[in-house]
Amino acid sequence: MRKVVIVGGGFAGLSVARGLARERDVEITVLDERNYHLFQPLLYQVAMAVLSPAEIAAPIRGLLSRNSRTSVLREKVTAVDLKQRRVIGEDASHEYDFLVLACGVRHCYFGNEHWESHAPGLKTLAQATEIRRRVLEAFEEAESESDPT
């Protein structure tokens, strides 16, 4: 049985896991910091209070539950040992025959982190709910404004 480790439970990682699930001689392990898949294209809807966070996040295990040879582990990967063919996480290491890195991206201010308070990222549920909080707070402040202009 060939062991495949997929780092990342986003669109790319899930697509690879689903495609490989058709193979009979493959054991798949998906590693992700979170235990849910986030449908990022709708994060703006959470930020604008149109959708709730639960409406755009689904458990990764549930999405991949059809294949008994697929396991999903909540694991933050800290290193990859290419010579020993191991992925090293905060809690454990995982051996592989094939490795797929589908980690996604993080918001970057190119060394200008002070911009974050004025231009927050929109890549996570925490960021979306913080933007939502700011928008709703601005509406509340506007309601109590005595000068309408």
Sequence positions of predicted segments:
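Beta1-alpha1 glycine-rich phosphate/pyrophosphate-binding loop at the start
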Residues: M1-S71, T149
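FAD-binding core/adjacent interface of flavoenzyme oxidoreductases
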Residues: T70-T149
